[in-house]
């Protein structure tokens, strides 16, 4: 089969300087791996792993590629594998962004979702799950990025030489994250020969065990959880070579997401969650230096995969990652504040079809009905169903004829017990003071509040 021209677009990604963020005495450069055809640095290893397996006979025509992935390796494997005519079956943890999963399915990959709250050795851990599928399915090839030498080889033979050439052979440090460890290991091998004085700096999510390993040489048997996707580990990958790492930074989810958002606003670069982790660590490293250095880090993948998370104020607030000034009353529990312009609403003169479309597009079960800036009613899924059941033409009816207009409101100063009582009676919790409407509190909002309080 002829090599698809798309494969020629993998690699040779741009290297651009950071110009509007404080980098101290240093020059910081970003390698835009988001410009690969599949949108991430993992396109490199997708091609490398598949071609190596074809060369040694582990992957035969008509075979199935199986992998455990945080999404991006799966996208690289699906992009290459589907173009080459293979079936691609991927196992992903349930914390992966909706955009990644939809992208995988759109490429023709089959996706199995498993738990993200269990560790290596558990049958539902995504790597163990994928390995089991590979053993059970005839003709399957387990890509096994965490143990596959073709993973670091891709970076040793492409990413490393590109960086060295693009920096004009003037480079002091590279800031990397570690998931499978292929990027770090491959770059370490390349620069050990090309420029042994180049330092490696680890950017590690809070909860991962890797910073402690770099600092102490010990492998912790306890790890936490983190929302950043694609980097951080609860074990040391078999292919990992961390001997070149001179410093490691633990970066919280808050720092990671704030940094990704700052990068977009300051430099116009839309990167993913792990890009924020790397950037936060790179900026810390740069600002600590007392002499000028040239530093490279990565935009690991495109931020279009995280629009529903990192770049979604509602999601960020639900996770406790977007802070509002506390008001110390029920307004702090409202997920979408009306006075902040966050509420999706309808008007009495809108049709039921309009209400339905807004509920569907925003995944909401009820909408406030607003007229002249004031709350006049609530319409929910049950209202719609009662009106249109077996009468599809009723979608053209007006919201004002169907909405609930007799509302029981809660004053902002009401206590949480009053809120629970309202929700327990199956009512919508409307927070208002006189004619001033603040927003709705759902059961999910209350759960989020309790989770944030406990954490």
For each feature predicted by the language model, list its residue ranges:
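PLP-dependent amino-acid enzyme catalytic core
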Residues: 1-333
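Short glycine/proline-centered loop/turn elements that form peptide/ligand docking sites
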Residues: 95-98, 342-343, 352
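Bateman (tandem CBS) regulatory domains
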Residues: 244, 327-343, 395-407
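The conserved cystathionine-beta-synthase
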Residues: 344-363, 370-371, 388, 408-427, ...
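Glycine-rich acetyl-CoA-binding "A-motif" of GNAT/NAT acetyltransferases
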Residues: 375-378, 416, 437-440
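Alpha-helical adaptor scaffolds
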Residues: 385-386, 390-392
């Amino acid at each position: 089969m002829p090599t698809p021209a798309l494969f020629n677009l993998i690699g040779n990604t741009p290297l651009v300087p950071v110009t509007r963020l404080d980098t101290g005495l240093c020059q910081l450069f970003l390698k835009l791996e988001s410009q690969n055809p599949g949108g991430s640095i993992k396109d490199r290893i997708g091609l490398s792993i598949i071609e190596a397996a074809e060369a040694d006979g582990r992957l035969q025509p008509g075979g199935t590629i199986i992998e455990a992935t945080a999404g991006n390796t799966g996208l690289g494997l699906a992009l290459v594998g589907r173009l080459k005519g293979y079936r691609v079956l991927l196992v992903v943890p349930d914390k992966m962004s909706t955009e990644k999963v939809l992208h995988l399915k759109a490429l023709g990959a089959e996706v199995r979702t498993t738990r993200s709250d269990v560790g290596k050795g558990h049958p539902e851990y995504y790597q163990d799950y994928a390995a089991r599928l590979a053993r059970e399915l005839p003709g399957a090839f387990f890509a096994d990025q965490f143990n596959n030498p073709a993973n670091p080889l891709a970076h040793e033979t492409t990413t490393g030489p590109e960086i060295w050439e693009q920096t004009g052979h003037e480079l002091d440090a590279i800031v990397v994250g570690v998931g499978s460890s292929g990027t770090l290991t491959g770059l370490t091998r390349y620069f050990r020969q090309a420029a042994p004085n180049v330092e490696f700096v680890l950017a590690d999510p809070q909860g991962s065990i890797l910073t402690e390993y770099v600092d102490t040489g010990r492998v912790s048997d306890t790890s936490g959880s983190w929302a950043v996707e694609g980097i951080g580990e609860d074990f040391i990958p078999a292919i990992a070579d961390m001997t070149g790492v001179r410093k490691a930074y633990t970066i919280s989810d808050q720092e990671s997401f704030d940094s990704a958002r700052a990068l977009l606003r300051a430099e116009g670069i839309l990167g993913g969650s792990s890009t924020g982790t790397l950037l936060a660590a790179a900026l810390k490293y740069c600002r600590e230096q007392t002499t000028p250095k040239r530093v490279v880090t990565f935009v690991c993948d495109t931020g279009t995969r995280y629009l529903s998370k990192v770049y979604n104020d509602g999601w960020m607030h639900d996770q406790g990652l977007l802070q509002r000034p506390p008001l110390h009353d029920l307004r702090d529990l409202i997920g979408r504040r009306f006075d902040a312009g966050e509420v999706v609403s309808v008007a009495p003169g809108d049709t039921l079809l309009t209400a339905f479309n807004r509920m569907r597009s925003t995944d909401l079960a009820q909408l406030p009905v607003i007229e002249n800036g004031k709350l006049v009613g609530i319409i929910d899924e049950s209202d719609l169903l009662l009106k249109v059941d077996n009468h599809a033409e009723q979608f053209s009816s007006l919201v004002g004829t169907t909405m609930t207009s007799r509302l029981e409101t809660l004053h902002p100063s009401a206590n949480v017990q009053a809120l629970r009582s309202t929700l327990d009676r199956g009512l919508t919790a409307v927070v208002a003071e006189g004619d001033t409407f603040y927003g709705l509190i759902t059961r999910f909002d209350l759960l989020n509040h309790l989770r944030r309080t406990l954490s």
